[in-house]
């Protein structure tokens, strides 16, 4: 699947907010200091949560914590927790237990004496990186956002070796692919978006186009672990449906577990990427009627949509499109391509977890707007700000 924007050609803007690592800089990490999450833990109120006022104070703090997680602690307009969470009293009856807790559930958990750190971990677990693309440029050509670069991943018996089959027909190890990426000046890394589980609505997202652009990040991996996790996420989102077998998923899980054991406490971005891999792998298995490794890590809207999609009914198809594929609200006031805009091309393989790419030209339009707004190209390693 290839989608090209309708904008006019132009020169490629420079990416001033990120800098590609060079060989020998594998030890470089994201900025040191306290993350928004840790800062919120330290700032947690010490009120008596058994009282009504104490519970409300703690609930307000939890709301700020969730906002800090979803917006990186920045000063941008915050998304209310009510908008982030889809959970309600009927969530468990709908099999939607993976939704982010509401602010009232936060208060209840705190009133029951739930440790602050445990509560924060519960929030963070629902923050997921999605929609991975490799970014490639060439003089006088559209910027290519390729999600289908890797057509297959073969995993060694112990999960330590990953052999990649590229769309070009070439085979190489993950380490060789990482080395090649470091040497290619036209490979600008990856782009991904940060969502919560409830915001991923199968064929659409529960965000306006302006909010989605604010959630996009460039990552130019500076370690082989980060690079491997980006490739693995991208592959899970674009895997050929006939390749989704139990044995293949077991081997991918072994590779993921091997990578997770290399993640240190301070490697916050790597932990985010690994968490995304877990959600994607378990959701993919559930959508293909395979036993998921952890049913709590199935994206909630997919869990509800799966049985509906299996029923063949013309009336039901219209309902599913209305529930999961509509962008009517999210595209309000989206500008048309400018004459000086750089053209972009989106390349992806039709797969279970990337239905949003097939939904008209919505995602390619968002990518074009994001790429042609250089100040929006935020460095993923800067998500964790320094608190003084």
Curated annotation (Swiss-Prot):
Q: Which Pfam families did the record assign?
A: Herpes_UL7
Alphabetically list the UniProt keywords: Host cytoplasm, Host Golgi apparatus, Virion, Virion tegument
- Which organism's genome codes for this protein? Psittacid herpesvirus 1 (isolate Amazon parrot/-/97-0001/1997) (PsHV-1)
**Gene Ontology CC, one term:** host cell Golgi apparatus
- Gene name, Swiss-Prot/TrEMBL: UL7
Task: Enumerate composition-biased segments (Polar residues).
Answer: 1-18
Record carries keyword rRNA-binding: no
| The family this protein is said to belong to | Belongs to the herpesviridae cytoplasmic envelopment protein 1 family.
Which protein is depicted?
A: Cytoplasmic envelopment protein 1
Subcellular localization, per the record? Virion; Virion tegument; Host cytoplasm; Host Golgi apparatus
Bias class Basic and acidic residues marks the residues at 23-32
Region annotated Disordered, chain positions: 1-55
Q: What does this protein do?
A: Plays a critical role in cytoplasmic virus egress. Participates in the final step of tegumentation and envelope acquisition within the host cytoplasm.
User: InterPro entries attached here?
Assistant: Herpes_UL7
Is the keyword Transport assigned to this protein?
A: no
């Amino acid at each position: 699947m290839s989608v090209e924007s309708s904008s006019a050609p132009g020169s490629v803007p420079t990416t001033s907010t990120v800098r590609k690592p060079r060989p020998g800089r594998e030890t470089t990490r994201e900025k040191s200091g306290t993350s928004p999450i840790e800062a919120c833990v330290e700032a947690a109120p010490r009120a008596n949560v058994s009282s009504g006022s104490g519970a409300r104070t703690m609930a307000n703090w939890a709301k700020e914590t969730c906002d800090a997680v979803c917006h990186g602690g920045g000063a941008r307009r915050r998304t209310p927790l009510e908008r982030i969470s889809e959970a309600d009293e009927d969530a468990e009856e709908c099999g939607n237990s993976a939704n982010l807790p509401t602010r009232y559930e936060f208060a209840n958990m705190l009133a029951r004496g739930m440790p602050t750190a445990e509560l924060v971990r519960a929030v963070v677990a629902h923050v997921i990186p999605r929609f991975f693309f490799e970014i490639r440029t060439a003089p006088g050509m559209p910027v290519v956002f390729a999600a289908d670069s890797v057509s297959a991943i073969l995993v060694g018996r112990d999960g330590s070796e990953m052999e990649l089959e590229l769309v070009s027909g070439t085979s190489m190890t993950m380490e060789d692919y990482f080395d090649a990426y470091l040497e290619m000046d036209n490979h600008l890394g990856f782009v991904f978006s940060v969502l919560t589980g409830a915001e991923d609505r199968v064929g659409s997202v529960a965000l306006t186009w302006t909010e989605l652009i604010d959630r996009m990040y460039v990552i130019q991996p500076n370690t082989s672990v980060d690079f491997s996790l980006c490739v693995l996420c991208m592959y899970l989102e674009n895997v050929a449906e006939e390749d989704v077998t139990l044995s293949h998923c077991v081997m991918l899980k072994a590779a993921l577990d091997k990578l997770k054991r290399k993640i240190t406490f301070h490697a916050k971005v790597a932990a985010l990427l690994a968490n995304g891999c877990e959600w994607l792998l378990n959701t993919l298995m559930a959508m293909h009627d395979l036993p998921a490794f952890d049913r709590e890590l199935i994206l909630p809207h997919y869990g509800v949509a799966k049985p509906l999609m299996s029923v063949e009914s013309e009336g039901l198809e219209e309902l599913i499109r209305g529930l999961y594929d509509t962008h009517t609200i999210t595209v309000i006031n989206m500008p048309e391509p400018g004459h000086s805009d750089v053209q972009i091309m989106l390349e992806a393989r039709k797969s279970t977890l990337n239905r949003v790419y097939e939904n008209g030209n919505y995602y390619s339009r968002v990518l074009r707007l994001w790429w042609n707004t250089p100040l929006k190209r935020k460095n993923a390693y800067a998500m964790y700000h320094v608190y003084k």
